């Protein structure tokens, strides 16, 4: 039977009858390990106005661990009398709860009897949020985590540090957040603020909650205390999601260097030929700083993985730094490139000694790491780095910028492009076991608010969820679009913005004779406003309620607003009146049909046909190859 579950399950079998929700749900976890999952499920049920409590003595919903199932797999069985959730692990049971939750969205007081047998295609189904370029509060991260749980994501990667901000409390280095978490508005902020003004769109304003004023100056930023991190990690864990921290090393480190200048080779914050000033990894004190920061992470993040970045490092300062040159000689390295490789290997060893696994962007494939480290492939224009990582025995997470960087602007084609991407083409099948999974990323240089993030993320993130979970033969874009409206409604209900479908009924450029009738079809649940003078519409502009006529040249500017009053993207269409063209000469006596000229042309470029020898002329009543035309054929048809 057809369901509206995203990602689509492996198998759904219809049963007889329905389970009535009116009598409430009494939950019994069969294993103490499942009590957090039972608490979570009870919370989900209450959010859907279903009475729920744990009651082992009179239960009508059971949670069980079943070692016969795949570790992350689950079964969900609904009969008129009871509901059973089984998982190969606690994570599997939480995935079963996610499917049950989606059935509740369309249940309307009852649930259909059915049986779902399901398991993921990939073990790693991740999402990365950049909180360094623009900061997102603990509450916003937790709200997003809840959306991830709905769609069976199981990794949340937090990009906690970068040139533009340090977002996690490190008790040994208090300046990292006291100073490094705050900045004078920078070029990224200026781009956002200019867009907010030009487009009359508050979702590009810097949130007031992330601004403080010091001596009359505005400072933007924010950070997570260690207690905040513990709360986020626990919240995610209850939802089957592991939180991966990223501390970007040894590049992308200006926020740290600005607080502790001795971390840089020359003590200055700045930029090189391509990237920002890196850490001075020739000094033992810098290595100690890195180890001390990572050590504090170990107590906060239970995850096996620690992401160290490793990308886009400006190595030129190391070439003239006495400390770095001394390190290069002492370690018998060949230049600055090998110095970074040495640093990455040392960090790998340090993490391994603490039971952690190094994870980094695909640049680390050049650093001679052991196969125990994992690689996140992002440079879609360099597929060789993906195959190199797999050939070297690394576990790999695919995160290609072309398909899974969701911070880019959207259009009508981007959802299909994301959905249609295949992570495991035939060329990679030999290394299938090395592919841990896939991850979507949200970089936030021009994304200052949750509403701006939501418009970029949704519904594309749901497409990523289906690619990560469902087998290729189960994925169908038309069916995905069929299931989508329910989920968009739930996003809106949860306070999350999403990209509205395009307004139908108008082209970008329009030419008309006399008058043009404009018939627009806005997305469901949206209000459409427009102007005819090129200005940006808002809710004070003309609202579209019925077709209208245009008689003069103008620019029609359209913008939709969702139920929460959040503005969608702006679309412009030009209208220009014209008249029928006058004949360039007396047509003389005309015959019905098309004039077809046959040229002796054997090329493949239409523009060159009439340069070949003319063979004959014909009159035809349609676009056909006339009788008698053989050999090299180049035809040009004229008429109207």
What are these regions (language model features)?
Residues 358-373, 379-517:
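Flexible, acidic glycine-rich loops studded with aromatic residues
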Residues 132, 161-165, 248-252, 311-313, ...:
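Active-site beta-loop-alpha junctions enriched in small/polar residues
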Residues 69-287, 293-305, 346, 350, ...:
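Feature activates predominantly on carbohydrate-active enzymes
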Residues 125-129, 156-158, 243-247, 306-308, ...:
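Hydrophobic faces of well-ordered beta-strands that scaffold small-molecule active sites
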Residues 1-124, 452, 456, 468-490, ...:
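Contiguous, structured surface segment used for ligand recognition
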Residues 256-262, 267-372, 379-388:
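Active-site neighborhood of glycoside hydrolase catalytic domains
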Residues 28, 471, 475-592, 603-605, ...:
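Short, compositionally stereotyped local motifs that mark structural "simplifiers"
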